[in-house]
């Protein structure tokens, strides 16, 4: 088996990802930089060829010879309108060779031209090497994914790229199909299911509707926007900060490629941060002409900057539903794919569109496709492990799950590394005569005694008819579903009386007491946050007032309307305040307010004289928004009677 491992590769437009199925589960493999996704970039320099992170990191220094987006060229003719329109936006050169596009670069001092298949094969080679480094032996067999709308020539070209990379391509499968396999949606055994896959990646947006019946996948409809993705959101942030830099420093950095590239990298990082935090800060030293650029952005502002792009994702969803002749109520499963679906606003729009339906997002969205491809690869290699046989191969239970029996002994019902979903039932009985009820305490862990394991929850089954010890039969069932949500049910066989508990979120489980304690701490922190928020708000108000006053008196249109002395007075005071701000970023709220009053005393008389008492321009403080309330990251334990 070891030498015959097959891998699954998600060959993406902007990023690629590789996974392998072994030891009964899928491993998504990290590259040498520790990243689980690798940029689909290839760069050519005077001395070497770079692939992946190394290529993307030097793109600012070497844009003409850094190739990306090969997936937009593969299997297309040079005259294809898509190729013609994309060419306008690429920094590298695309040439025509017998109506086939080729990418022209300078490599080791010579001009070279490569077919898109060759560029893609370099990325595939990189993915193959990443897998080999992890597995410790050569790998040849692979399943590679393509968008559902790829035509035959694009599929064949992708397969050729695999062959060039030295891979035996077992199969080319559709990305949405791979994502559905990752979530085990083909194994629910519930008859025909309609699945909508919402795939918002780095460069493209695809909506697919699949019908799955008895393991057979049928693509019913595809829609989307081949030029909408994470990079567009980055661009909005870049433009926003270019404008901010103009406002603050009166300089336009948009023509300086290196500055824009550094800004873009910081924006991409900030965007990722905003999926989990409500505010992100950017710190770029010496961005342009020696000026350091330190700033921040809130999630709300980011959502506003991209609101039209986010909303536009729903149109293809409607189109796909129309084409599939389905109503939104007829969709059984919604699956999120692509890193950009981590954005909370995108999730909310989709969820609201489907009237609050749950989204499948327990697998990392940028890894779901490679995950499914790895599963498919294992099946095609005839992997006989029981996990693949009834492959609801979602995951495994990381720790044994069981309950406490007499004397504090841990009795495991579900052993660690069992494939989930799974269901186990065992009969227990009472410990003493006429015992009226039993306390079911659910634990996870490998130790023999429950006191050394982790308590997940407990519930009581009462109303057991009086009987000698050992007579009552209490049936306990542990049932974990594909998302790792555990349901424990206890039933008294004689009366049919039952009680259950649901434990969700197997990561960092917390007991009720801990949650309670955290709620109280959060209240305390909230008060501290409030003080901090007001402080930042006062600082921002002062800063923007100072900059506004400065621009007001420097306005060309005011030449001659304001005396040089007055102008100097305002500018000096503004400069003094701005310098003070830079030196005292951590001052208290009242200090900022005091400075503001000082500045107003200087500026107001001059500005009001200037506008004949019409009042100066407002100060428009940008109040920084702090994090919103509880984030619901703890587990929820619901008791059901």
UniProtKB/Swiss-Prot annotation:
ATP binds at residues 12-15, 71, 202-204, 268-275, 339-342. Testis-specific. Coiled coil: none annotated. The modification N6-acetyllysine is found at residues 77, 108, 246, 348. SUPFAM superfamilies: Actin-like ATPase domain (SSF53067), Heat shock protein 70kD (HSP70), C-terminal subdomain (SSF100934), Heat shock protein 70kD (HSP70), peptide-binding domain (SSF100920). InterPro entries: ATPase_NBD, Heat_shock_70_CS, HSP70_C_sf, HSP70_peptide-bd_sf, Hsp_70_fam. One of its GO terms (cellular component) is cytoplasm. The N-terminal nucleotide binding domain (NBD) (also known as the ATPase domain) is responsible for binding and hydrolyzing ATP. The C-terminal substrate-binding domain (SBD) (also known as peptide-binding domain) binds to the client/substrate proteins. The two domains are allosterically coupled so that, when ATP is bound to the NBD, the SBD binds relatively weakly to clients. When ADP is bound in the NBD, a conformational change enhances the affinity of the SBD for client proteins. Belongs to the heat shock protein 70 family. This is Heat shock 70 kDa protein 1B. It comes from Bos taurus (Bovine). The gene is HSPA1B.
């Amino acid at each position: 088996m070891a030498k015959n491992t097959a891998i699954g590769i998600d060959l993406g437009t902007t990023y690629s990802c590789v996974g392998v199925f072994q030891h009964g589960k899928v491993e998504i493999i990290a590259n040498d930089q520790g990243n689980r996704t690798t940029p689909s970039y290839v760069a050519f320099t005077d001395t070497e060829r770079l692939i992946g992170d190394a290529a993307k990191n030097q793109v600012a220094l070497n844009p003409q010879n850094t190739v990306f987006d090969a997936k937009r060229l593969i299997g297309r003719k040079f005259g294809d309108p898509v190729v013609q329109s994309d060419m306008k936006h690429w920094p590298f050169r695309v040439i025509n060779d017998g109506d086939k596009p080729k990418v022209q670069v300078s490599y080791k001092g010579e001009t070279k031209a490569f077919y898109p298949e060759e560029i893609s094969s370099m990325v595939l080679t990189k993915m193959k090497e990443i897998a080999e480094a992890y597995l410790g032996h050569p790998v040849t067999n692979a399943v590679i994914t393509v968008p559902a709308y790829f035509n035959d020539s694009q599929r064949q070209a992708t397969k050729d790229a695999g062959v060039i990379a030295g891979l035996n391509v077992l199969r080319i499968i559709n990305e949405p199909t791979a994502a559905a396999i990752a979530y085990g949606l083909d194994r629910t055994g519930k008859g025909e299911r309609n699945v909508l896959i919402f795939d918002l990646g780095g460069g493209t947006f695809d909506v697919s509707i699949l019908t799955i019946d008895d393991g057979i996948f049928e693509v019913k409809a595809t829609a989307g926007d081949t030029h909408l993705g994470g990079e567009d959101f980055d661009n909005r942030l870049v433009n926003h900060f270019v404008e901010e830099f103009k406002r603050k420093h009166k300089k336009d950095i948009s023509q300086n490629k290196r500055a824009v590239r550094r800004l873009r990298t910081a924006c991409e990082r900030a965007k990722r941060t905003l999926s989990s935090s409500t505010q992100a800060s950017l710190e770029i030293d010496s961005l342009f002409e020696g000026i350091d650029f330190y700033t921040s952005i809130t999630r709300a502002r980011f959502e506003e900057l991209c609101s039209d792009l986010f909303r536009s994702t729903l149109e293809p969803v409607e189109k796909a539903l129309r084409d599939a002749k389905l109503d939104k109520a007829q969709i059984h499963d919604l699956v999120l794919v692509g890193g950009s679906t981590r954005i909370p606003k995108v999730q909310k729009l989709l969820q609201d569109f489907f009237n609050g339906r749950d989204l499948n997002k327990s697998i990392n969205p940028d890894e779901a496709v490679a995950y499914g491809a790895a599963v498919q690869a294992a099946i095609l290699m005839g992997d006989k492990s029981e996990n693949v046989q009834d492959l609801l191969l979602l995951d495994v239970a990381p720790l044994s799950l069981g309950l406490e029996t007499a004397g504090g002994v841990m009795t495991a019902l579900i052993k660690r590394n069992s494939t989930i979903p799974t269901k186990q039932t065992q009969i227990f009985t009472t410990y003493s005569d006429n015992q009226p009820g039993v306390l079911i305490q659910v634990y996870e862990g490998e130790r023999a005694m429950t006191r050394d394991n982790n308590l997940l929850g407990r519930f009581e089954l009462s109303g057991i008819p009086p009987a000698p010890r050992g007579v009552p039969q209490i049936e306990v069932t542990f049932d974990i579903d594909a998302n790792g949500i555990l349901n424990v049910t206890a039933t008294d066989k004689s009366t049919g009386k039952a009680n259950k508990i649901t434990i969700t979120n197997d990561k960092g489980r917390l007991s009720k007491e801990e949650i309670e304690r955290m709620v109280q701490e959060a209240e305390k922190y909230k008060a501290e946050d409030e003080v901090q928020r007001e402080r930042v708000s006062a600082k921002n108000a002062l800063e923007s007032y100072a900059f506004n006053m400065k621009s007001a008196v420097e306005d060309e249109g005011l030449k001659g309307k304001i005396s040089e002395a007055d102008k100097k007075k305002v500018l000096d005071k503004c400069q003094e305040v701005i310098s003070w701000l830079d030196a005292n970023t951590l001052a208290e709220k009242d200090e900022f307010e005091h400075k503001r009053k000082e500045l107003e005393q200087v500026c107001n008389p001059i500005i009001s004289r200037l506008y004949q008492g019409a009042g100066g321009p407002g100060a428009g403080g940008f109040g920084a928004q702090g994090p919103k309330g509880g984030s619901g990251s703890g587990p929820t334990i619901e008791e059901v009677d």
